[in-house]
């Protein structure tokens, strides 16, 4: 059993002001517990999991999570209403508090499976998928989408897509990555950077449809920018910034709750009970420490902290003492800075 650090602000709620985007190869269960330590009120999302994998795959590996992660949402991939409904029902049985349908991933592999961003061209099908899931679960069923695909420059088409989706589910929530998705010519990484951001479209959507809960994603790299967006929309979803500089999650969470900031080292040490349980279960440290690399981003000693974890984490016998070794470098730097 995974120990619980602090459940005071846990539980399933309708607060979508801060969330962490579903990111393939990043937001696994170990990353999500770390993010929960940093941001007690944030909504967390899994990596995308295809509906067929949920139905036929290793559910413990794909769906297992610690109770402290709540509220946590499962992001599903797929385009077959019946399969998505079956997968959603399984996910709710596993305790997920939200089901999110991926309509934004532009990768070739996802396109070959006829889901992800290409679904934005089929709003009626997306509505059928959402309705099928909403009919069999009691938790919110939401969608994460782009503004359009390829050279679409039609706000009306985007708004129509949202209308189709929102009418299919009682949750009335949409997550929008404020860029188009290019289905040819760009890699997934380039698709997160090259298509221009159009925050004005997302603001307009919220202004014209005030009954919708609109969450904005894309290009948010600071707490200040996120708070500015919250003047216009209901929530912000952080992606790469939350992984590359995870302390931003703590800063944002504290800004929303008017709580004092805690030192990075204190937050990291709060993760120790979880790490020790995972190690006892046979996990190697390298699967965990890769999510910690950015915690001291831009801080004195931050680069060496990462190097120690990277190199030492490869050892099969590495344990929490490696993290303490890396932290000692940071604390030595802080002591030196205080003296001089």
Curated annotation (Swiss-Prot):
Enzyme class: oxidoreductase
Enzyme Commission number(s) from the entry: 1.3.1.-, 1.3.1.91
UniProt keyword terms in alphabetical order: Flavoprotein, FMN, NADP, Oxidoreductase, RNA-binding, tRNA processing, tRNA-binding
Catalysed conversion reaction: 5,6-dihydrouridine(20) in tRNA + NADP(+) = uridine(20) in tRNA + NADPH + H(+); 5,6-dihydrouridine(20) in tRNA + NAD(+) = uridine(20) in tRNA + NADH + H(+); 5,6-dihydrouridine(20a) in tRNA + NADP(+) = uridine(20a) in tRNA + NADPH + H(+); 5,6-dihydrouridine(20a) in tRNA + NAD(+) = uridine(20a) in tRNA + NADH + H(+)
Organism superkingdom: Bacteria
Residues the record lists as binding FMN: 22-24, 75, 144, 177, 217-219, 239-240
Active-site positions on this chain: 105 (proton donor)
Gene3D superfamilies xref list: 1.20.120.1460, Aldolase class I
Cofactor(s) demanded: FMN
Alphabetized CDD domains for the sequence: DUS_like_FMN
Gene Ontology terms, MF aspect: flavin adenine dinucleotide binding; FMN binding; tRNA binding; tRNA-dihydrouridine20 synthase activity; tRNA-dihydrouridine20a synthase activity
InterPro entries given in the database record: Aldolase_TIM, DUS-like_FMN-bd, DUS_fam, DusA, tRNA_hU_synthase_CS
Pfam families the UniProt entry points to: Dus
Swiss-Prot/TrEMBL site (Interacts with tRNA) positions: 102, 189, 192, 303, 306
Assigned protein family: Belongs to the Dus family. DusA subfamily.
Function: Catalyzes the synthesis of 5,6-dihydrouridine (D), a modified base found in the D-loop of most tRNAs, via the reduction of the C5-C6 double bond in target uridines. Specifically modifies U20 and U20a in tRNAs.
NCBIfam families: PRK11815.1
Name listed for the protein in its UniProt record: tRNA-dihydrouridine(20/20a) synthase
Lineage summary: Bacteria, Pseudomonadati, Pseudomonadota, Gammaproteobacteria, Lysobacterales
């Amino acid at each position: 059993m995974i120990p619980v650090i602090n459940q005071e602000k846990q539980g399933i709620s309708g607060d979508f002001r801060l969330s962490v985007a579903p990111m393939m190869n990043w937001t696994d269960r170990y990353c999500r517990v770390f993010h929960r330590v940093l941001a007690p009120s944030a909504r967390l999302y899994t990596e995308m999991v295809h509906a067929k994998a949920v139905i036929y795959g290793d559910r413990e590996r794909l769906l297992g999570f610690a109770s402290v992660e709540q509220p946590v949402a499962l992001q599903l991939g797929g385009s077959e209403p019946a399969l998505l409904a079956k997968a959603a029902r399984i996910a709710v049985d596993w305790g997920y508090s939200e089901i999110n349908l991926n309509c934004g991933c532009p990768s070739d592999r996802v396109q070959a499976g006829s889901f992800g961003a290409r679904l934005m061209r089929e709003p009626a099908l997306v509505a059928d998928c959402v309705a099928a899931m909403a009919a069999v679960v009691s938790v919110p069923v939401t969608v994460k989408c782009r503004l359009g695909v390829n050279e679409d420059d039609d706000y009306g088409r985007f708004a129509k897509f949202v209308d189709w989706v929102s009418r299919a589910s009682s949750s009335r929530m949409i997550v929008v990555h404020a860029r188009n998705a290019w289905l040819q010519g760009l890699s997934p990484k380039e698709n997160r950077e090259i298509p221009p951001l159009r925050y004005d479209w997302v603001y307009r959507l919220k202004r014209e449809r005030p009954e919708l809960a609109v969450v904005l994603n894309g290009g948010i790299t600071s707490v200040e920018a996120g708070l500015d967006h919250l003047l216009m929309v209901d929530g912000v979803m952080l992606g790469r910034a939350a992984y590359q500089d995870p302390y931003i999650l703590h800063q944002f969470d504290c800004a929303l709750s008017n709580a004092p900031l805690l030192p990075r080292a204190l937050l990291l040490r709060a993760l120790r009970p979880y790490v020790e349980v995972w190690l006892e279960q046979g996990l190697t440290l390298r699967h965990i420490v890769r999510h910690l690399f950015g915690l001291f981003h831009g801080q004195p000693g931050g680069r060496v902290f990462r190097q120690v974890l990277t190199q030492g984490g490869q050892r099969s016998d590495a344990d929490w003492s490696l993290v303490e070794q890396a932290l000692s470098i940071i604390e030595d730097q802080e002591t030196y800075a205080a003296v001089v």
